[in-house]
């Protein structure tokens, strides 16, 4: 399986606190059947001011430490980027780490605030599209505005966005509403990816296998294979080829 959303780089956001926790997270992922993992630390202007250059250095260090620890996982780096008007300057300067490219279009893991869908979100996503950037919206099922007004899902889809569900939402870890939205989106064929959004060993570990079983029961083995393997593999091919 491919996990395209995780916070496994140590000490740079609200994910792994240190190298020991990073390695523990990688071991959990490996034991769960994950073969490829993309570190997607937050880029949230004013809170987590991570840069593409620094992240590339950080992933190189983690790759070496994982190798030294005998962990056999393919690792790559991108970012989970918070929607903010100030991102425009970073886009124009070529400073955003994309999570992949398909058919010459760059893909960006674009996070909405957890509490709401910001005003002007549609204009910003349209602007990204004009820059040859397609947004993947992570964990839409956990956004409070979307929970209250599911029509946002339809609007985001109309804008060309793809969706990535959190594996633990499908299991019910984020509440009944997030689970119900996840199931509804899966049944309607609105989901392109499922990922762990791993942050910590105890509370938010990188586990996908149980969610994959649930998705298989819900929409079939072939569709589950697309969400957990085929789609993320195709998306991130350029990251793992580097």
Write out the residue ranges for each language-model feature:
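An N-terminally biased module of ancient metal coordination in phosphate/nucleic-acid-related enzymes
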Residues: 1-71, 154
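Active-site neighborhood of phospho(di)ester-bond hydrolases with catalytic His/Asp-centered motifs
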Residues: 2-4, 38-40, 76-80, 136-138, ...
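Non-catalytic positions within long, well-ordered alpha-helices that form the structural scaffold/packing
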Residues: 30, 129, 157, 186-187
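Active-site environment of divalent metal-dependent phosphoester hydrolases
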Residues: 44-47, 82-84, 142-146, 170-173, ...
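Extended substrate/RNA-proximal surfaces in nucleic-acid metabolism proteins
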Residues: 49-164
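Short loop-to-alpha-helix "cap/lid" segments that border enzyme active sites
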Residues: 175-184
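Short acidic/histidine-rich active-site segments
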Residues: 190-206
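Mid-to-C-terminal alpha-helical segments outside catalytic/metal-binding sites
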Residues: 208-209, 213-242
């Amino acid at each position: 399986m491919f996990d395209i959303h995780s916070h496994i780089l140590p000490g740079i956001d609200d994910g792994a606190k240190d190298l020991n926790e990073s390695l523990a997270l990688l071991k959990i992922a490996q034991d769960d059947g994950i073969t490829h993992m993309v570190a997607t630390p937050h880029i949230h202007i004013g809170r987590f001011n991570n840069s593409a250059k620094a992240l590339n250095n950080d992933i190189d260090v983690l790759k070496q430490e994982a190798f030294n620890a005998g962990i056999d996982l393919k690792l790559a780096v991108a970012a989970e980027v918070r929607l903010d008007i100030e991102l425009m300057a970073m886009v124009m300067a070529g400073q955003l780490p994309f999570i992949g490219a398909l058919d010459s279009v760059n893909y960006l893991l674009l996070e909405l605030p957890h509490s709401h869908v910001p005003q002007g979100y549609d204009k910003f996503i349209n602007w990204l599209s004009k820059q040859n950037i397609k947004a993947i919206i992570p964990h839409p099922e956990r956004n409070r505005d979307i929970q209250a007004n599911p029509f946002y899902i339809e609007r985001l889809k109309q804008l060309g966005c793809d969706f990535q569900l959190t594996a633990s939402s499908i299991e019910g870890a984020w509440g009944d509403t997030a689970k119900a939205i996840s199931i509804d989106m899966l049944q309607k064929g609105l989901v392109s990816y499922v990922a762990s959004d791993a942050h910590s060993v105890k509370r938010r570990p990188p586990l996908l296998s149980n969610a994959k079983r649930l998705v298989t029961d819900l929409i079939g083995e072939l569709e589950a294979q697309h969400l957990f393997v085929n789609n993320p593999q195709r998306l991130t091919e350029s990251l793992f080829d580097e």
